[in-house]
């Protein structure tokens, strides 16, 4: 049960592409076949599944070592000894005290993977997943590629992060298919959950503090621990390249700390190659949908506790539809970086000494991380509901079900032409597909008398204007999170559509320059591979041409007859982001003081937006999203319109109002040659 016998005929890892750096059409020969791993669980014994013989094929270059040996190797490493010596000199602390602290840090973070707990988790998750999901679809060719890769080189599993369920389902799949159980980088709050934290630790989780800051010893212990796992091939290592769970359900720009750690053994020549495996996890309905929306509106995130988990068991009574897990083709780091980096420079420094990556290598690592996220996006499986959410957010006053069906079918055709994967049940009629999706998402939408509306929270007593806006915003943000799962499909064509509207002329150069401005502005909002503005522009134009929306020559770009509807629709997808940026720019220019603390900004901008929504001056409730507001500050920092300093352990910003005004004008009126940002792209 659960063995690879049923996939023995599938293609193996040797078909991994030599390079995907330039983002050619992804996995053109990838199979469409997905297998529901819960189908077998519904027919046979969960206890037999958990207790069956588990015999994964290990990495051929690894000598099996125990957890104790792994930890001892870290503590006795020359690298850690060197860093401790540096701290002794800098802080005048005794070596024994620092060694004791390092040992305590390692005890706090390290995993203690034990097969017995994997079996326990496997049994429990079989029960839970059958209650939560109607199906968990997995691409078995991807697992066959992974099985081969695990035997050849150290493997890094890199899933997107949308739910607390993510790492559980991946370990469950690996166990089901007799693949080596990964060790998983997890946040320290999970460790604090009584009993559950220890189960996670013994199921392969190692725990990382979020706020490491300048703690040199912690960095040294963590980085040596990660490098030792990779160097020895102890187990596949899993981490979220986005760093955090996405509260908006769209991709986040990558965090590079772990990426540097896992790649360092390759740079130092300690391993011949490393395989990176992008994994796309797509939910038809997310367990935390309401929680995420309220977090974006400033409601504090509840602490991860065992008691909270037990209270949340009511989710077991609900239906969360299908989940799709797509394992991408393993990518060879050696092949990806071939000809792009001179590894000899790192042979000049002893391997046991800390390694500082030069600017060129840091840029390559950043590009690689961004590419992984783009591959995750391209392998994502869109649901009918994702497409419906795009349309509903452009019709917040409600829409007739027949028209919603018609527009969803139209958008499905556009999405497929844009290269998306869309799950559309073949055994149901179009009306049945729409009806089942509305039923599944009863917490977000309702259908009354043939018309579809967003559902708003209902509370006791009279409702103030502010409470009414808050409830409306929560409903919109819940719906927007599902649109966000599809937004990457439309990003580049939509940016071309906006650039065509704002450019000073229809000349290709003018459209391209405004496209580059939008790309720079939204680089924290949407994921773009650095330095590929031309490729992104060509992709956006190419998709619009392919759909018959535009005509393009070397000199100009024009909308074709019959293409205006698509252009308007695509612009509307980006409109909530554009309006959010416009509102924050207005606040910084007209309402904000010259300097402000981050907390003061959060409360001030929320009050400002609330007033504008109540007065009807703005229409987009997504402006209230705290993530959107943080992304805008990050964009202005990058574009030198803000500066940031630390004062009393708090972030203090200083705003250059004239620079913000120039960016605001460009967003409203289009790029002009007088304000060039080419050097930044």
Predicted region positions:
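Membrane-interfacial terminal anchoring regions of lipid-handling membrane enzymes
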Residues: 1-681
């Amino acid at each position: 049960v659960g063995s690879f016998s049923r996939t023995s005929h599938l293609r193996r890892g040797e078909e991994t592409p030599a390079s995907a750096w330039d983002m050619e059409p992804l996995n053109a020969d990838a199979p469409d076949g997905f297998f529901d791993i819960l189908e077998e669980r519904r027919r046979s014994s969960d206890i037999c599944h958990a207790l069956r013989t588990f015999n994964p094929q290990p990495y051929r270059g690894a000598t099996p070592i125990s957890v104790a040996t792994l930890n001892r190797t870290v503590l006795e490493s020359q690298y850690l000894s060197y860093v401790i010596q540096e701290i002794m000199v800098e802080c005048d602390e005794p070596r024994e005290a620092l060694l004791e602290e390092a040992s305590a840090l390692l005890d706090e973070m390290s995993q203690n993977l034990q097969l017995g707990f994997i079996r326990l988790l496997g049994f429990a998750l079989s029960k839970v997943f059958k209650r939560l999901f109607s199906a968990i679809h997995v691409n078995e060719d991807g697992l066959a590629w992974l099985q081969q890769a695990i035997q050849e080189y150290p493997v890094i599993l890199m899933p997107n992060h949308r739910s607390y369920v993510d790492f559980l389902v991946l370990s469950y799949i690996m166990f089901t298919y007799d693949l080596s159980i990964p060790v998983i980088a997890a946040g320290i709050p999970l460790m604090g959950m009584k009993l559950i934290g220890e189960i996670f630790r013994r199921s392969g989780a190692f725990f990382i503090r979020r706020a490491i800051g300048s703690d040199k010893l912690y960095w040294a212990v963590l980085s040596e621990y990660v490098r030792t796992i990779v160097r020895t091939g102890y187990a596949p290592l899993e981490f979220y390249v986005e760093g955090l769970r996405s509260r908006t359900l769209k991709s986040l720009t990558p965090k590079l700390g772990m990426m540097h750690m896992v790649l360092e053994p390759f740079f130092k020549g300690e391993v011949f190659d490393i395989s990176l495996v992008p994994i796309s996890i797509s939910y038809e309905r997310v367990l935390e949908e309401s929680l995420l929306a309220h977090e974006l509106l400033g409601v504090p995130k509840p602490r991860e506790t065992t008691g909270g988990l037990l209270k949340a068991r009511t989710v077991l009574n609900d239906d969360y539809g299908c989940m799709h897990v797509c394992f991408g083709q393993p990518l060879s780091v050696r092949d990806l970086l071939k000809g792009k980096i001179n590894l000899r420079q790192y042979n000049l420094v002893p391997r046991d000494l800390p390694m500082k990556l030069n600017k060129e290598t840091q840029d390559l690592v950043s590009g690689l991380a961004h590419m992984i996220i783009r591959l995750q996006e391209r392998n994502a499986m869109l649901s009918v509901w994702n497409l419906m959410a795009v349309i509903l957010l452009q019709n917040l006053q409600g829409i007739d079900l027949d028209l919603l069906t018609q527009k969803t079918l139209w958008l499905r055709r556009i999405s497929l032409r844009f290269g998306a994967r869309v799950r559309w049940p073949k055994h149901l009629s179009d009306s049945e597909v729409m009806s089942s999706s509305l039923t599944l998402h009863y917490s977000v939408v309702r259908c009354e008398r043939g018309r579809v509306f967003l559902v708003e929270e209902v509370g006791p007593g009279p409702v103030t204007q502010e409470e009414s806006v808050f409830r409306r915003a929560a409903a919109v943000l819940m719906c927007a999170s599902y649109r966000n799962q599809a937004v990457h499909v439309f990003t580049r064509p939509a940016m071309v559509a906006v650039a065509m509207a704002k450019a000073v002329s229809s000349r290709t150069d003018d459209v391209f320059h405004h496209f580059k401005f939008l790309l720079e502005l939204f680089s924290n909002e949407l994921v773009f591979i650095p330095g590929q503005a031309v490729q992104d522009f060509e992709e956006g134009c190419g998709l619009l041409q392919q759909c018959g929306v535009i005509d393009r020559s070397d000199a100009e770009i024009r909308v074709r007859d019959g293409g205006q509807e698509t252009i308007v629709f695509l612009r509307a997808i980006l409109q909530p982001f554009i309006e959010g940026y416009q509102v924050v720019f207005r606040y910084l220019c007209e309402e904000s003081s010259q300097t402000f603390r981050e907390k003061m900004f959060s409360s001030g901008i929320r009050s400002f937006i609330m007033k504008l929504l109540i007065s009807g001056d703005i229409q987009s409730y997504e402006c209230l999203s705290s993530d959107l507001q943080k992304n805008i500050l990050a964009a202005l920092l990058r574009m030198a319109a803000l500066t940031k300093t630390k004062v009393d352990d708090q972030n203090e910003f200083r705003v250059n109002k004239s620079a913000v005004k120039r960016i605001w004008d460009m967003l409203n009126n289009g790029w002009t040659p007088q304000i060039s940002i080419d050097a930044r792209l």
